[in-house]
Amino acid sequence: MKATFVLACLLVIAAVSHADLLPKRMDANAFRMSFGKRSVSNPAEAKRMDPNAFRMSFGKRSAEQNEQANKEDKATSDKLYDDTKFEEMKRMDANAFRMSFGKRSDAHQAADDQVEYVNDDFSLPEQKRMDANAFRMSFGKRVNLDPNSFRMSFGKRSTVGYNLDARNYFVGLGRR
């Protein structure tokens, strides 16, 4: 029994040594040489992807989807909205949220001053400015006020769910 086991082990060792399972050291230039070559003969199929392709096409639709949407629009002409408007809104402006932070909504403006609001370029910077104490006022408050949220399931003294981001808290607190 032991003899057959030893013979089987020797046979396996001999097979492994001849099989070259461990890769030999690769030529350093082999990878570099093959890097520029295209594996596909047809260059139209081997196009490299544009790095911005996903970002740019996020809000767009493909040509097939556009054709289908146009056919559906023609079939149901009594739609309330136009699909072309959604294609124009491709990406949100990066500053849109920041710009609108300190602004008052139009409803508040109409209620405050009963005068028709004139959109002057002079008045815009005044509205864009954020209240100096707005961040400090919100410092210790709960961020999520939904009673059914996951954060509320922790204990009452848990700091999870509180706005404890102190990066801008001490800005402007220095001597004047």
Curated annotation (Swiss-Prot):
Disruption phenotype: Defective preference between different food odors. GO terms for biological process: cellular response to carbon dioxide; negative regulation of nematode pharyngeal pumping; thigmotaxis. The keyword Signal applies. This is Neuropeptide-like protein 1. Residues 59-79 are annotated as: Disordered. In AWC olfactory sensory neurons, required for the detection of preferred food sources. Keywords: Signal. Residues 1-19 form the signal peptide. The gene is nlp-1. Residues 61-79 have a biased composition (Basic and acidic residues).
